[in-house]
Curated annotation (Swiss-Prot):
InterPro entries: Iml2/TPR_39 (IPR019412). It comes from Yarrowia lipolytica (strain CLIB 122 / E 150). Interacts with lipid droplet proteins. Its main location: cytoplasm. Inclusion body (IB) resident protein that interacts strongly with lipid droplet (LD) proteins. Involved in LD-mediated IB clearing after protein folding stress, probably by enabling access to the IBs of an LD-stored soluble sterol derivative that acts as a chaperone in inclusion clearing. The gene is IML2. This is Inclusion body clearance protein IML2. The keyword 4Fe-4S does not apply. The lineage of its organism: Eukaryota, Fungi, Dikarya, Ascomycota, Saccharomycotina. It is found in: Cytoplasm; Nucleus. Keywords: Cytoplasm, Nucleus, Phosphoprotein. Pfam families: Iml2-TPR_39. Belongs to the IML2 family.
Amino acid sequence: MLKALGLGKRGGDMPTKPLNNSTVSLAIMDDALRVEEAFIAMDMVMDDRSKEALKLIQKDEPGSSGKSVAREQSAFYKLVIGVIYFIEATLGFEPESIRRASEALAEAEAAAVRQKRNVSNNGAHVSYSKYPPGTEYRVAFAEAELMGAITLFLSESYLESVKALYKLRKAYQTLDEISKSIRESKKPAKSSDHKSTLDSLSLAVSDDQEMASLVEKFQKTRLNRLNESNNATPVASSAASMNTTTSSATALHQGSETIEEFIESGVDLCFGILQLVISIIPPTLGKILSVVGFRGSRDGGLSLLWEATNYRNIHGALALLVLLQFYDGPTQFSDLILPGTEEDLIQQGKYDINTADDTEITLTATITGGSGHSKKVHTLPKNPRRRMHKLLLAARGYYPHSALWMLQQGRMEASQCHLEKAVDIMDADIGPIEMKQVEALMLFDKTMFMLFLNRYEQSATNFIRLIDINAWSHAWYTYVAATCSIEIYRENLRAGNAEAAKKAKDTATRLLTEAPGLIGKKKLMAKTMPMDVFLSRKISQMQQLSKQHNIDLVDAAGVSPVQEVVYFWNGYGKMPEYALEKVFSEVLAYSAAPLAPSHIPEQDNEKTVRHLLQAVALRNMGKVEEGYKILNDNVISQIITESNNKYHYNKTVTHKDPWMPPSALYERAMFEWVMHGPKGTETVREWLHLAEKWSDDYELSTRVGMKIKSAFERLDGGALA
């Protein structure tokens, strides 16, 4: 049957005879079955069962002579393989994973092009859905192109990056065209015409045994996927005896719905991602992309992604992951909180995600395509975290074996300042984790939350464990473990536990000595990782002080190094009050270790960093005026001078911590916002501009710059809270 459709051999892209109605009906069901099986396989991937997914789509079929169906025929199957390798590549950044993903996605692209060509060569005048013939293959092609472009960007090659832009442009144009078809199909006449066509096709196969067998298999597969338990065992159904005209018509309609689901959810996801990403990249890059046809709309992109979450398939799951990253990612970490938002209620301790308003807001969003603009009314959740929470709980049910969704649930709890609950969720045992990259991500996030809770012993142990399960950032993990050990050493000094203090000190010394030798083992885009640059400078400064004053390396550490890490990861905004109290009263009360045998006076640069961290901690404790005074009197005065009612950079002071001055200027802006709210917007902007213009490039400039950019977006109304 597949050979009759021109799908059964490599030469299947050659012209064949036009399809008759009976063959078109069989083709619809066969296509729909492949999509359903691909959906199930990709659900398995989302449930951390990639091996099962590969086994499902690479099984042999009767008459296939032992050859893999996935390798010879289905673009949808090849897309599944591409998705599996793509996830591995983007989570691990390993060269071999990137190469494998690129090859698999290239095969998926080629298969989609070949099968789209088959449809044209066969002269099919009847579409398998309400969209033009072969649209499902165009969507598969666009998905493969989009993932392939991202994979090429990871290859660290200029030539590959140029190829990636070309792929992105093709994917964008394809999705733009299909998006127009989808909007056109919403017209009542179109749907009615397609329904009549399907009804007439069913008459041609009312007694066809091959059709009956295909219908039975399709409906069992479809029911299996739609079963919320996501059990891989096929669900028994009444489809086994479906061989009447009525059942054929029903099956054809269901098959058409499956194909339409793939098309619509795929476009919502992929075009939504493109629209959103293009809208939030830096303006300079955005202008360059617009010249070559890329145009984005944040609201349009978000609305498409929210629409995609209505589908119970891989596209809906990935859309939810993107939304979780958008709302609880970098923009969520902004300290500039708008009044009346979810974040405002969270900060006040008045937010209950289970009772939050679940209504929607209506807006006119501009969907921007290569041929111009079109306006469309969309609804977005008034409280997106409430909606995401419900979807996330459903995803945990759909994918019970996956640590990926446990990770997302933990992150969501942490974003609401429920650190203990987040750690408890991530501590739950769900059995072995197949995706080691997800295991590493969850362990890292959980360990950072423990760090925010001042659990230094557990954190140190976990950072060392991360070295064993993650190929990246070994120098950074070693350094942070060392900073935890330094804090354990100081805690034991305060408690008078000499033996425990010595043990922690020895561990910290060993780790600080090892960390520099691990720098450069892994690079991103051929550059040393920013945190590696930071830790190299920090350890070098400790070594210089150690030699200069003839003291132990650990006693030259200065202000709590682990609290610098907490600050870089926006930990103060998530800490419970008791953790903040301890940090302020004990950890940030001094630099270095006054009780240590080899204590030296506090260095000027260490004192400045300590005062900056104290000020931020106090603001998050609600002691705004006290924090403002510490920041203004002890930090800002060394960075900024004022004359003629204008601020100027103080060039007379040399700063040994390059990240500190722009960070302090940013924090000054945040104090203005907390103290004066929207009334102080102009002053807030002034301080943000000072932070933004401090320097084009400095240590951790990307991390600090993201916070500054996020604050500007909030002020401009450019980010949904």
